[in-house]
Amino acid sequence: MRKIIVGSRKSKLALTQTNWFIDQLKALGLPYEFEVKEIVTKGDVILDVTLSKVGGKGLFVKEIEHALLTKEIDMAVHSMKDMPAVLPEGLMIGCTPKRVDPRDAFISKNGASFKELAEGAILGTSSLRRSAQLLAARPDLQVKWIRGNIDTRLRKLKEEDYDAIILATAGLQRMGWDNEVITEHLDETLCVPAVGQGALAIECREDDKDLLQLLAHMNDGVTEKTVAAERVFLHKLEGGCQVPIAGYATLTENDAIELTALVGSMDGSVLLKEKVVGTDPEKVGLEAADRLINQGAKELILAANKEQQ
């Protein structure tokens, strides 16, 4: 019986996601056993600066990918939104399980909704994507950076001067905390989710044919298609955590992909948004990127990068 070593970050959420996925694989009843190897990533260690200042995308996966390439582990369970648009040679996304709720969760100290927040209220987020879109809707708000895992951020909301914070609904759901803590779900029209938000990426080596066959059982075709369109868009714009960039695709009743793509200025005063519908994920992603580039997205990205240097 082959033992599959599964790499995971050490956070509660990462381990919850990893163990959930292993349970799904075990339920298939195939001759494999599993062991979790916990790995510390750069993103887990550097908590005193915003993600965008320390290298953005890839911060939570580089060390894990190194362990895959050196065969210390056989596969890894990641949050799709942490995945860089391009993977190292020899690695691939072996499967994309069914996506859960992609929306952002708004959590306020006193139960006020986003619209009800007092003028000048302090909103905690470490995401340029969230801050740009929410400042566009409420320019009166003050954004204050907040880092750390879910428990840390919820504690900071209680103990520090934040009036509200934003977290991914998916993470709270996976921890079983969504009903307790979420004040409201932010509609995708108000705050377009991050590329891949709510989805998991199971990464493995391209040449591990046995494992790829096993992972195929867990692949969700709709999630694979929609996330592929989002990631093509992200790659074309070379966007990471350093830029207010968002992309969320769904499948229509006719099986067409509908992608909403957005690039913004850091302060939210400019938001460029496009909706593209098509059947081919690659074409849809490229079309969305091209349309935004024609509107001036590249200039916004350059300005955002400059602002953070």
Curated annotation (Swiss-Prot):
Q: EC number(s) on record?
A: 2.5.1.61
So which cofactors does this thing need?
A: dipyrromethane
PROSITE patterns, per database record? PORPHOBILINOGEN_DEAM
GO CC annotation, single: cytoplasm
The annotated pathway is: Porphyrin-containing compound metabolism; protoporphyrin-IX biosynthesis; coproporphyrinogen-III from 5-aminolevulinate: step 2/4
Xref: InterPro entries = HemC, Porphobilin_deaminase_cofac_BS, Porphobilin_deaminase_N, Porphobilinogen_deaminase_C, Porphobilinogen_deaminase_C_sf
Q: How is the cofactor bound?
A: Binds 1 dipyrromethane group covalently.
Q: Give the top-level enzyme category.
A: transferase
Q: Which residues carry this modification: S-(dipyrrolylmethanemethyl)cysteine?
A: 241
Read off the Pfam families from this record. Answer: Porphobil_deam, Porphobil_deamC
- Reading the lineage from the top rank, the first entry is Bacteria
UniProtKB keywords: Porphyrin biosynthesis, Transferase
Q: Which reaction does it catalyse?
A: 4 porphobilinogen + H2O = hydroxymethylbilane + 4 NH4(+)
Gene Ontology terms, MF aspect: hydroxymethylbilane synthase activity
Write out the GO biological process terms: protoporphyrinogen IX biosynthetic process
Q: In which family does this protein belong, per the annotation?
A: Belongs to the HMBS family.
The protein's job, in short, is: Tetrapolymerization of the monopyrrole PBG into the hydroxymethylbilane pre-uroporphyrinogen in several discrete steps.
Q: What else is known?
A: The porphobilinogen subunits are added to the dipyrromethane group.
On assembly, the entry states: Monomer.
User: This protein is called what?
Assistant: Porphobilinogen deaminase
> What is the gene called?
hemC
